[in-house]
Amino acid sequence: SKQLGPDIIHKFAKQRPEMNRTEGWGLYSPQAEANLQSVMGLQTLNSIRSVDFLLTLPEVDPTRLAVTGSSGGGTQTMLLAATDPRLALSYPVVMVSTAMQGGCSCENATLLRVNSGNVEIAALFAPKPQGMNTANDWTKEMSTKGFPDLQKLYGLYGKKDFVTLQRGEHFPHNYNAVTRMGFYDVLNRHFKLGLESPIVEKDYAPLPKEKITVWDDAHPAPKSGDPDFERGLLKWLKSDAQKQLLAAAKTPEGREHVLRPAIEAIIGRPFAQAGKVGFPDASTQWRDSHFRTQGRLLNATYGEEVTIDWLQPINPTGEVVIWLDDSGKGAARLADGSIRPELQELIDRGVGVLTADLFLQDDKGLKQTRVVPGPREVPAYTFGYNHALFAQRVHDVMTITSYLLTPRDSSQPAVKKVSLAGFGQMGAVAAAARAATGNAIAKAAVDTGTFRFGQLLDYRDPMFLPGGSKYLDVPGLLCVASAQPLWVAGETDAALFPTATLQKDGMDAKTAAAAWLLK
């Protein structure tokens, strides 16, 4: 962190207009977050490279590598242990708990702890030896909240005694001599050092300053807090990732095993876990040419609800089109309340049309999303623990799709095929939903309106999505979505989705999309 400086690494508080731009952006900006570029990620990379260095030393036994650290160092200990398989033992200090998860900006990253936390991160190291401790801080309840779960997990491997907790609630936040003795004991036992226990620290002669000084006249320290370095580093990281991801997009294996899992990760919910959905307050009425069913779908698994308006034909074919635009459940109707002609054609041909108010969608139009209250404008403080609104709207599409495809009693018509159409801001939502649901959605018509996550200048924008730009932005979504029949408007370059049908110039997008869906 020398080149970036402590004000950026540890004390960041306010968004920087000069670093918030579509080219040459800085850390904590919407562009950096859309590319999953973070201080925590850089520190974890530094930790991995430190292991690389250690393994070049002839005196290092590669089978006995351990990591330990306290507080923020405890966070890095957990992250390195979770991501680097070369480590044999981990000892995070005053960090693992079910309470506060890491207060510094360097300990947080968007997506990191959504529906998860430090206990689960520590659990990723199982069944390898791991120790931790408690103090009179946020870890003080660990003996009853978190540690028993780790013991149970280790017990599944038959290694319950491979995870230990040193109690020390009478000490403040620390890595004191008593705590260090606990680490020494775990290290001695599992690395078979053969030392007499307990291991007591002894006085030692510190190395002279010249022996432990990194920077000197021959090796001058780099400039600290260098904005040009920061911009250049993030630009290189973006370029390096793009080269690899573009290569992946060219092969079926890359699309299915690189891009699709990444999209599922940033959306935060695979379709297989869409949830148990019911329609308890469905109300159906006959209209001149169709049945109209209204009400709320309730996703019992996640405590979510989606208000829908489902227009069902008299002679259904078993196909339903989920039709999304920025007007929510009013998307099927013109200003006078009549059904849009292209959708009436779908209904007359036996295709159901379902519109919905996705999360926080109303006729007022949301300008900014909610964030966790606090003085520091760090996106990870909100989106490291909560789904972005964009992702939640994709979840709603999954809820609708899951309900439609789940067999049920005869009170609702059987659905054999679900298609999807999205326009306005909902175009990108539809693209993401199609990409994240595999073959559950048979056909998709998407008007992107040229939208790109990487063009957003506000991390509170309703369209903001952590990681949204990293995996080739909206064209990356369309690339994965094109595994099934896909119609696209708003795009001029179809290199990443050559099998898709592109809108012809001059045609109304909704009319053209409806006609394509009928083919």
Give, region by region, the residue ranges found by the protein language model:
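Alpha/beta-hydrolase-fold serine-hydrolase catalytic core, especially in secreted/extracellular enzymes
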Residues: 126, 133-321, 327-352, 359-410, ...
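Short, solvent-exposed loop/turn and secondary-structure capping segments
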Residues: 2-12, 78-80, 92, 101-105, ...
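Short beta-to-alpha linker loops that shape the active-site pocket of alpha/beta-hydrolase fold enzymes
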Residues: 1-2, 357-361
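Core alpha/beta catalytic barrel or barrel-like domain that forms the active/cofactor pocket
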Residues: 2, 19-22, 26, 90-98
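Alpha/beta-hydrolase active-site loop
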Residues: 6-58, 366-410, 473
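Primarily recognizes the serine-hydrolase "nucleophile elbow" in alpha/beta-hydrolase
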Residues: 42, 49-114, 400-477
